[in-house]
Amino acid sequence: MLRIETYHNSPDTPYEKMRILLNSAFQERKEEGIDFAYATYTVEQLKEHVGNGFYIVAYDNDTVVGMVALIQKERYGIRYSTHECLAVLPSMSNKGIATLMFQTFLEVAHQVDTDFIISTTAEKAYSSIRYHKKNGFKTFLFVSFPSTPYYSYCFIYPIRKFKLLKYSVFNKPVFVASYVFTKLFKKENNG
């Protein structure tokens, strides 16, 4: 029986089970040469990474089959959340688990009064890109982070409508300009 649980500063958070899930879920990415740091996280790194955020965890009976983290941030008086560590057990993929977790993620985002959600994924993580587009995220930047050996798409999902975001972030020319600049002047490892 599938169920979704949300953890926030809880001693019951199943960190070890989530660590095992991340390792399993990102094995295919590692084989493709996409080295997600989450795939090798320890329990302590998981705890530290999310800090005061939320883990949304999917269970099939007592087995952890999916997870995603919501991390709250604020900059210039704007509250936003990051959508991180999305993972589904490979044997459970394409069963709607990520979509169910995202519905819970949105509920939590509304509860914590966030303005928008930001997420990133590797340029070649095709299933992740499909997931983001299917769930209403809009591509707004193409970047190369110093901490990753690959190019990344940045996605945004608005919770509240902002004129500034509507006209600057969702503007296709902004994405195209960032794509061209990154491909011309940046290496995949931001070098």
Residue ranges of model-derived segments:
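Conserved GNAT acetyl-CoA-binding A-motif
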Residues: 109-121
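A short beta-loop-alpha structural element at the N-terminal edge
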Residues: 1-20
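Conserved acetyl-CoA-binding loop of GNAT-fold acetyltransferases
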Residues: 133-143
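Conserved beta-strand-loop-alpha-helix junction that forms the acyl-donor binding cleft
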Residues: 119-129, 147
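Conserved acetyl-CoA-binding loop-helix of GNAT-fold acetyltransferases
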Residues: 88, 94-107, 134
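Acetyl-CoA-dependent GNAT
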Residues: 23-78, 84, 89
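C-terminal "cap" of GNAT-fold acetyltransferases
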Residues: 145-191
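A short, internal acetyl-CoA/4′-phosphopantetheine-binding micro-motif in the GNAT/acyltransferase core
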Residues: 83-94, 121-122
